[in-house]
């Protein structure tokens, strides 16, 4: 059992950004294991998923949110509503801006959603995909962008979640923004997501990646049966894909 320090901190951090800017990959890197599915296809994340990071002096609950975008469908509208609801109850916000894409109207819209947040950081993601001089120019551009929309930013951190480059630094900077509090979850868990939900998400990830041309992106997976195989350390799972 870990003894918590007097100044132990705990709280929630929302990770937001446009679709496909590396939010889910970053959550997995921060937590240290895969709890969120990832895909090159937009809006793979449907529900806010909480990753729990427990350290001797803090516990951080990172909330992976669906990508914020101009909705064209009812699903898109509902995903945006989920993000707005989560922003109201977090202690800090991390905006993800990819190093290999231009800053656009979507990023401006997202930034304006958190103008009233006192603790905002920006992660310039996917730094492994650009050259050093391009990254330096992007960091300057991001700073100017934040100032232009009136966003007060505590830190701008370039990271590569894929290579886990500067993710430890980002984690420590986010931890500084948390309030003093005892841990909110048991220290031995890394997500509050039920095992069955994790399994359905992994199946959905495989379906999206392998059947993207054949099935709609709005597929839903349900578990029909899950039984532990006798004498083995794995389960037999029967699931249904609803399209």
Give each language-model segment a name.
Residues 14, 28, 47, 51, ...:
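Solvent-exposed alpha-helical segments within well-ordered globular domains of core cellular machineries
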Residues 188-243:
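Long, well-ordered amphipathic alpha-helical subdomains in the mid-to-C-terminal portions
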Residues 118-121, 128-195:
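Canonical P-loop GTPase G-domain recognition
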């Amino acid at each position: 059992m870990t003894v918590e320090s007097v100044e132990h901190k705990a709280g929630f951090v929302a990770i937001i950004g446009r679709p496909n800017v590396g939010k889910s990959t970053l959550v997995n890197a921060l937590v240290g294991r895969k709890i969120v599915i990832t895909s090159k296809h937009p809006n793979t994340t449907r529900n806010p998923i909480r990753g729990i990071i427990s350290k001797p002096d803090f516990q951080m609950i990172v909330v992976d949110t669906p990508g914020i975008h101009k909705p064209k469908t009812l699903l898109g509208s509902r995903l945006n509503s989920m993000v707005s609801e989560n922003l109201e109850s977090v202690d800090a916000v991390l905006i993800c801006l990819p190093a290999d894409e231009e800053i656009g109207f979507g990023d401006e819209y997202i930034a304006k959603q958190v103008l009233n947040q006192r603790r905002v950081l920006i992660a310039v993601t996917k730094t492994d995909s650009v050259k050093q001089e391009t990254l330096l120019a992007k960091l300057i551009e991001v700073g100017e962008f934040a100032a232009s929309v009136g966003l007060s930013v505590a830190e701008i951190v370039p990271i590569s979640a894929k290579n886990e480059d500067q993710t430890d630094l980002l984690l420590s900077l986010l931890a500084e923004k948390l309030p003093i509090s005892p841990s909110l979850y048991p220290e031995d868990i890394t997500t509050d997501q039920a095992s069955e939900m994790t399994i359905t998400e992994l199946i959905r990830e495989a379906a999206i990646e392998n059947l993207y041309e054949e099935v709609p992106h709005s597929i839903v997976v349900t578990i029909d049966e899950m039984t532990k195989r006798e004498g083995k350390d794995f389960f037999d799972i029967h699931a249904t894909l609803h399209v």
